[in-house]
Amino acid sequence: MKNLNIYIFSMIAVGMLAFSCENAIQADEDGGNQTDTTSFENDHDSEKSEALKIADPENIKTKMIRTTLNAKSESKATGDITFEERTGQVVMEAKFKGLNKGTHAIHLHEIANCSSSDGKSAGGHWNPTGERHGKWGDAEGYHKGDIGNFEVGDDGIATVRFETAEWCIGCDDENKNIVGRSVIIHQGGDDFISQPSGDAGKRVGCAEISEYQEK
């Protein structure tokens, strides 16, 4: 009888020990999996957050210039122009009023000076690389200020949008920096052939490109 009691006690003890070990192993496995997953998710969320931060437009530096077109050569031209640089691209957006119907040339000129009544105080085309005048992107050459032509309707209103990586705002590259230049609107269209400026006629509007803001 005594031996039977010892045997039963031993079996109970062994069973309790096995149950305890099984629970301990299960707890360790559950705990291990939870820790790994949490750590992985935290790392992933951190990387994702950093990527979103970099991609967030609010974290990208922007340079902007706002300028106003003044009438020249007894025209009635007016307008507002903005230049915005972001991620290596400069976008020019403009809205003009008071222009005659038809084709007009728009160029960047070399000096930010619109003081003269005919706009000639702005100098010639901005051409820092010494190229021949031509249509933008022409393999035979073009000025950095050779934006091109735009059309004006019966209402005298026109909008212009131009985007390029060949300009910059306030950078150290004088072949790209548009600060210190002027926007000139001409009476007629640019033929992209006549030298040195395309035979576009009088300067009917001028806007100085000077101070810029960075945000």
Predicted region positions:
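C-terminal motif of bacterial Sec signal peptides marking the signal peptidase cleavage site
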Residues: 17-20
